[in-house]
């Protein structure tokens, strides 16, 4: 499965991930989002999504490892992938039937969202 990770760019942006090459994704408080983090497996693909004023998918990453030993604070190590050729905006997502039932649209505050293959391709411009 693929996932989308939301981040406020003023806190940690895709540019920060590009600089760092890898990071640990943790500190997620929503129980559904934590469950999605715990379900991740090494090698799975991620879309990095900027919240706030940008509201757009900006790049990709890959799951390196998952430490779910603390159910209330699962930690996922991710490594940077590629920047999108252009950001894919929330308006584009909402206009696409691929996302009609997606938590990305239906649960706007969810910070870790499962994606299917077609959604991943749309969000990355593939």
Where are these regions (language model features)?
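Short, charged beta-turn/beta-strand-edge "cap" motif at the junction between a beta-strand
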Residues: 49-55
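A generic structural signal for short beta-strands and their flanking turns/coil linkers
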Residues: 1, 21, 42-44, 57-59, ...
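Contiguous surface segments at macromolecular interaction interfaces
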Residues: 1-11, 29, 68-126
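Hydrophobic beta-strand signal
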Residues: 47-48, 62
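Short beta-strand-centered aromatic/proline hotspots
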Residues: 56-67
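Compositionally biased, charged N-terminal/linker segments
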Residues: 1-42
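Surface-exposed flexible segments
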Residues: 15-19, 62-64, 91-96
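Hydrophobic/aromatic beta-strand segments within beta-rich folds
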Residues: 42-47, 112
